[in-house]
């Protein structure tokens, strides 16, 4: 079984060395050094978290909260570094999703493909 864990460690290393990860890490460093970008991103992420928690608790999001979230999103999208960060997060998310799909393929033999 240790072979599976060895392969997981290799995959971790490959991910850390990927262009997607390096770009994301670089953008995080740049944002941390930019007080305005850092504050904008922190505020946006906190608002996202607050709204997600409300939804998980079954609380309806108000129209005002939805508008505020939309305005905050538009604001962070206008900031070049944050916009690039979000693009890189999406790219890395696609890679991780692809890896997850590949890793779980053997389970499809047992359980079938839920997407079919």
Swiss-Prot record:
Q: Which Pfam families match?
A: Com_YlbF
For this protein, the record's SUPFAM superfamilies field holds: YheA/YmcA-like
Task: Kindly give the InterPro entries that the UniProt entry links to this protein.
Answer: Com_YlbF, YheA/YmcA-like_dom_sf
Q: Which family does it belong to?
A: Belongs to the UPF0342 family.
What's the protein name?
UPF0342 protein BH1149
Please give the organism: Halalkalibacterium halodurans (strain ATCC BAA-125 / DSM 18197 / FERM 7344 / JCM 9153 / C-125) (Bacillus halodurans)
Q: What is the lineage of its organism?
A: Bacteria, Bacillati, Bacillota, Bacilli, Bacillales
């Amino acid at each position: 079984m240790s072979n599976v864990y060895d392969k997981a460690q290799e995959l971790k290393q490959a991910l850390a060395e990927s262009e997607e990860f390096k770009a994301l890490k670089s953008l995080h460093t740049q944002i941390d050094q930019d007080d305005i970008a850092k504050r904008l991103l922190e505020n946006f992420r906190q608002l996202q978290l607050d709204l997600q928690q409300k939804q998980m608790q079954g609380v309806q999001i108000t129209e005002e909260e939805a508008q505020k979230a939309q305005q905050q999103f538009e604001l962070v999208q206008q900031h070049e570094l944050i916009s690039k960060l979000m693009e890189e997060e999406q790219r890395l998310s696609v890679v991780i999703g692809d890896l997850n799909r590949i890793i779980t393929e053997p389970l499809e033999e047992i359980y079938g493909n839920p997407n079919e």
